[in-house]
């Protein structure tokens, strides 16, 4: 009596292994891709938070002017811009903050709105 596997059994086992290995590699590749996106969004959020903090230190008149600049963080150059918004309420001021890796803002990674009171603090 012969012991061992037939050629068909070996080929079937290799095909199953190849399919499962491909699936594992695709999952790992997707996880690495997601990690890069999450890292970009996190750092862009930090840049936006820094700009929000600076806006809180400005006067109401300074916040009412559109501003644009760049910041270096986590080994990359980030571009940010602030856009004042009309709220229809004299006691409330809103400013949109956008952050991008591109100077032309073709792809905005982080966008948020900051609200400021017109009473108290710096005017």
UniProtKB/Swiss-Prot annotation:
Gene Ontology annotations for the cellular component aspect, listed alphabetically: plasma membrane; type II protein secretion system complex
Subcellular location: Cell inner membrane
Modifications the protein undergoes after translation, according to the UniProt entry: Cleaved by prepilin peptidase. Methylated by prepilin peptidase at the amino group of the N-terminal phenylalanine once the leader sequence is cleaved by prepilin peptidase.
Ranges in coiled-coil conformation: none
Keywords from the UniProt entry: Cell inner membrane, Cell membrane, Membrane, Methylation, Transmembrane, Transmembrane helix
Bilayer-crossing regions: 5-25
Membrane topology summary: Single-pass membrane protein
InterPro entries: N_methyl_site, Pilin-like, T2SS_GspI_C, T2SS_protein-GspI
One Pfam family this sequence matches: N_methyl
Modified residues (N-methylphenylalanine): 5
GO biological process terms on file: protein secretion by the type II secretion system
Lineage top rank: taxon: Bacteria
Gene3D superfamilies listed in its UniProt record: GSPII I/J protein-like (3.30.1300.30)
Propeptide: 1-4
Assigned protein family: Belongs to the GSP I family.
Role: Component of the type II secretion system required for the energy-dependent secretion of extracellular factors such as proteases and toxins from the periplasm. Part of the pseudopilus tip complex that is critical for the recognition and binding of secretion substrates.
Self-association and partners: Type II secretion is composed of four main components: the outer membrane complex, the inner membrane complex, the cytoplasmic secretion ATPase and the periplasm-spanning pseudopilus. Interacts with core component GspG. Interacts with pseudopilins GspJ and GspK.
Name used for this protein in its record: Type II secretion system protein I
Organism: Escherichia coli
Name of encoding gene: gspI
